[in-house]
Structure formats: C-alpha cells, structure tokens
Amino acid sequence: MTQANLSETLFKPRFKHPETSTLVRRFSHGAQPPVQSALDGKTIPHWYRMINRLMWIWRGIDPREILDVQARIVMSDAERTDDDLYDTVIGYRGGNWIYEWATQAMVWQQKACAEEDPQLSGRHWLHAATLYNIAAYPHLKGDDLAEQAQALSNRAYEEAAQRLPGTMRQMEFTVPGGAPITGFLHMPKGDGPFPTVLMCGGLDAMQTDYYSLYERYFAPRGIAMLTIDMPSVGFSSKWKLTQDSSLLHQHVLKALPNVPWVDHTRVAAFGFRFGANVAVRLAYLESPRLKAVACLGPVVHTLLSDFKCQQQVPEMYLDVLASRLGMHDASDEALRVELNRYSLKVQGLLGRRCPTPMLSGYWKNDPFSPEEDSRLITSSSADGKLLEIPFNPVYRNFDKGLQEITDWIEKRLC
C-alpha cells in the first residue's frame, strides 16, 4: 500500500472520534498562571495544548509553518468541545488539530515522493514524520486519530532513514511478561561497534522526535543513538508506566551485548524531562552497564511530590501524566498520591551515593524542574556535574547546553 493510500485509509472522514482534551476527565484547578519553559513551550490563552515552538523549530519546522497551521485552526468555525479553546474542534475535519497538522505533513510526504534526489527526499520524509508527531501531540492514550498519525510518522521516519546519511536499524527487544518493543538504532558513518547513547525521552514526545539530537550532536563525534518509546505510547503502547519507570530501558540495556553494532562497554543514558527519571534509575540499578548519565530539565522529585508545584503546571501536562499512569478518571487527589510514588527520593534512590557519573542541566525558574532536582542528582553522584542553562536567547543557549552535555558524554565514552 502506498503512503498516500495509507493516509486515506487511516483518515477516512468521520466525526465520532473522541476529541483530545476530553480523554482525561480530571477535576480542573480553574485559572492557572501562565507557564513558559524551554523544553515544553508555553501556555497561550485559548489553547488546550502547550505550544512548543522551540522544540518544533529545533526538530526542523519553519516558524512560519507553525503559524500557518495555527491560523487554520483558529479560523475554523466547526463545533468545538470548548468554545473558548481553539484546538478542540470535534472530528477529523478542517480546524481539528490532528487534521491540520496531518494535512501539512501530507504536503511534505508528497514532496518526498516527487523528489528524485535521495538526500532531499529523506529530508522531506523526516519533515513529514515530525509534523505527524505534532499532529499526535500530546499523545494521550485512547486518542484514535493521534495513534493513526503516530503510525504515519513511524512510516515516514523509516522512509527518511533509508535516504539520510549513516545507517538506521529498527530493532525488536523482548521484555518478559509482555509484548516486545521496537527501537531505532542510529549509527554514524564508519565501522562499529560504536559507543552509544540510550535516549530516554519526555512523556509528551515520541522516540522519532530526537533525530536532530543524533544528527547535530552525537553523529559528528562517532556516537550512535538508540531510542525506544516511553511506556504507554508508540511502539511501547502495550506497557503502562509504573513506579519501575526504567523497566523497558533496563531490558534494552541488558540486551546490548548481543547487538553487534553497539559497544556495550561504552554506553551512556540521556534523559529529557521524565526521561531523566528513567535515566537516573538506570544509574543506580544498572551502574556496571553505564559509563555516564546526563539529564536535562529532570522530573525526578519536586513535581511528583509537591502539591504547590503541581498547581503551577498546565492542565495538558497533568493530563499527560494521568494518561501515562492509566488514571483517566482519577481525582486530582488520587493522581497526587500516585505521582508521589514516582519520586526517586521517595523510592529511596536519590540521596544515596551513586557510582555512575551524572550531569544535570537546568533552567532557573523552570516550573517543571527546579534547580533543587538537578542538585539532588549531581550531589548523589560520585562524579556529578551541575549545568545551568540561561533562558535567553533560548535557542542559542539550548544548542550550547546540548553541546556541553555531548562534550561531557563523549569524554566518558570515547
């Protein structure tokens, strides 16, 4: 089946699909203060989703393209779940968030099919994959249309990988007690086995969102990158997120001696946001298998245990947490009790001495990850490094921070 035909099959016009903002039924906190963060974007009045311009631009989307799609959503007069929120149009039609971003992705998909230059075609496929992922954002469980967009993103990503520099292998990993999971191993030019970074992504992202990290930072240094989806989304959708948050990544780590392209004696983990929860757990539980662990904006304690901090977080992000935990109908009180169990300090890990070198990067006044969380990580390590990343200029400092983190990882791997 061609890519175009697959799109038509998946996205037949229907209007009974549940609208994304209705999937998690929590009691609302009411009015919330505006939130802005480098990794998560910011709350904008009249939008349910956080608008994450920095990360979307970093992944290769033109700012004008973002504004164009937003404008189409705003201008729609179709029925909405909440008339006050632009991105709550019901059904797969004009104005619906998933429809508009997927439509934009199909434009690039068609460009990719028409392009004769393999590298340029690969770029177009990658662009389409990124747009399909934005269509599926924030990847809530039970969002049928979003899951269809994710399927198209994965297909486009595989097409891109066949044409872009280096090599990518789709790999299946067995996990006892449940379904196998699929990961992508990105390898630079040259002969392996390669030193490798195991990517632990955020809860509102897919594993295919991190190609820029590999291409700009790891590949030029001869480092491979292995990604898997976080529990409950994408290729890991059959696994629920539990307090043993690092379960899937641990099984992948244990399988690496059997992967011929990976030098299993030179492996590091890199965690974004909640992915840092996974990475730091690995630092404690699998220290013989890891040379280093790096974190960026870690969610390891405060957000999970501090009610005041949770009150500052946008509704969408709390919906993401509830969705990952399988608590779609839970009260806020029940969600708070459960989140507390995910704190690595409450679990008795953070605060204990850890032999694995750990770096943690943070932004001042980050509503999701205060400086104290990063200090807790680095002070627990026998070889800790704290990295403050200035907020403005946001894009340049984000790039500089990633360069410093990659330097630090490279010294411990190579």
Curated annotation (Swiss-Prot):
Instruction: Provide the reaction this enzyme catalyses.
Output: a carboxylic ester + H2O = an alcohol + a carboxylate + H(+)
Coiled-coil residue windows: none
* Entry protein name: Esterase FrsA
**Matching InterPro entries, A to Z?**
AB_hydrolase_fold, FrsA, FrsA-like, FrsA_esterase
**What family, per the record?**
Belongs to the FrsA family.
Q: What is the documented function of this protein?
A: Catalyzes the hydrolysis of esters.
User: So what EC number does this one have?
Assistant: 3.1.1.1
Q: Which keywords appear in this protein's UniProt record, sorted alphabetically?
A: Hydrolase, Serine esterase
HAMAP family in the record:
FrsA
| Alphabetized GO MF terms | carboxylesterase activity
